[in-house]
């Protein structure tokens, strides 16, 4: 059903957003480290 897919995509995208934020932080730290 659409509701199931909707909840699945929401539950999947939340950790994905967190991971992207963490990767962004790591990238910023590495850039600061090299500069």
UniProtKB/Swiss-Prot annotation:
Which biological process terms from the Gene Ontology are attached to this UniProt entry? response to pheromone
| Tissues and organs where the protein is expressed, per its UniProt entry | Antenna.
Q: Which residues form the signal peptide?
A: none
Q: Name one GO molecular function term.
A: pheromone binding
Keywords (alphabetical) are: Pheromone response, Pheromone-binding, Transport
Q: Which family does it belong to?
A: Belongs to the PBP/GOBP family.
What is this protein for, i.e. what is its function? This major soluble protein in olfactory sensilla of male moths might serve to solubilize the extremely hydrophobic pheromone molecules and to transport pheromone through the aqueous lymph to receptors located on olfactory cilia.
Subunit structure as annotated in this protein's UniProt entry:
Homodimer.
Q: What is this protein called?
A: Pheromone-binding protein
Question: What is the protein's species of origin?
Answer: Orgyia pseudotsugata (Douglas-fir tussock moth)
